[in-house]
């Protein structure tokens, strides 16, 4: 769902989630949802609750929430090493919510001499997550939320390898088409790796793949009405390249 850049991502978020579920293959059941603080609000939380889908969502750290957390005294320490991680759970109602919900708060700090860091609140880094997973421990909710980061790697590769973040024109429709073509190229590359590449090369990003196979000295020549690419003999992956060529020919 491509939107203008001046529209907040939380606008019509529930409708966006409903469309996403509708596009899933028949019989595919969603058990959990993870989302960052850009997707928030009463309607969005109700969407998952009404469908009995577990969710974890990052919350914006506000002064009101900070005051609520400041009243909490019984933190549970989960990690007690060079970096200390503690957590609490509380029932909290934001001003825009119709009801109170479970909020877990995780705080982290680097260890200093002794245990004096508890005396200085500014040393702690706080994160808040809203959830309906009432029987989960705060640390498990936090770790489960952080597993969403794997999709960020795909977005990063699409940016670095296919420039999906580049806006080429002033036309929304043209830019949408440009983005769709880039996403299609990314998907074709992923399918190409799965069908035509050696197992050791299937984990390569597009940047690594270009470095391994495309940035190679060569010359294009014309002979007998054919265009031929002659690759330098120093290219040490010629046999791998030939096997990929053969697999591509078998597909076409």
Q: Where are the model-predicted features located?
A:
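Electropositive, glycine- and tryptophan-enriched low-complexity nucleic-acid-binding patches
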Residues: 1-27
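Short amphipathic alpha-helical "interface-anchor" segments enriched in bulky aromatics
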Residues: 138-177, 181, 185-193
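Short, conserved catalytic/metal-binding motifs centered on acidic residues
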Residues: 30-40, 55, 129, 151-158, ...
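Glycine-rich, histidine-containing beta strand-loop boundary motifs that form or position
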Residues: 1-2, 35-36, 57-59
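Short, surface-exposed basic-aromatic patches at helix termini and helix-loop junctions that form
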Residues: 45-54
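An anionic, glycine-rich sequence signature occurring as long contiguous blocks
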Residues: 54-160, 218, 247-252
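Acidic, metal-coordinating catalytic cores used for nucleic-acid/nucleotide bond scission
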Residues: 33-41, 61-63, 173
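A short, flexible helix-boundary coil/loop motif
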Residues: 188-252
């Amino acid at each position: 769902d491509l939107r203008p850049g001046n529209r907040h991502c939380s606008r019509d978020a529930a409708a966006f989630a409903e469309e996403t579920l509708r596009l899933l293959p028949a019989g595919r059941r969603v058990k959990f949802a993870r989302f960052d603080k850009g997707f928030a609000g009463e309607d969005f939380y109700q969407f998952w609750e009404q469908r009995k889908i577990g969710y974890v969502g990052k919350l914006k750290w506000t002064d009101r929430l900070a005051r609520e957390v400041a009243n909490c005294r019984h933190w549970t320490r989960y990690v007690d090493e060079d970096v200390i991680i503690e957590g609490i759970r509380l029932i909290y109602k934001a001003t825009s919510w119709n009801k109170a919900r479970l909020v877990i708060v995780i705080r982290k700090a680097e260890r200093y001499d002794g245990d004096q860091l508890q005396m200085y609140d500014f040393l702690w880094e706080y994160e808040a997550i809203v959830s309906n997973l009432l029987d989960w421990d705060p640390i498990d909710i936090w770790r489960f939320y952080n597993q969403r980061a794997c999709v960020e790697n795909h977005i990063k590769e699409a940016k670095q390898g296919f420039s999906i973040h580049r806006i080429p024109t002033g036309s929304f429709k043209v830019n949408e088409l440009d983005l769709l073509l880039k996403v299609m190229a990314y998907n074709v590359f992923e399918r190409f790796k799965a069908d035509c590449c050696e197992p050791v090369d299937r984990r390569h990003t597009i940047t690594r793949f270009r470095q391994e196979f495309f940035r190679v000295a060569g010359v294009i020549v014309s002979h007998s009405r054919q265009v031929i690419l002659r690759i330098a003999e120093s290219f040490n992956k010629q046999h791998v390249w030939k096997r990929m060529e053969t697999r591509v020919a078998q597909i076409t």
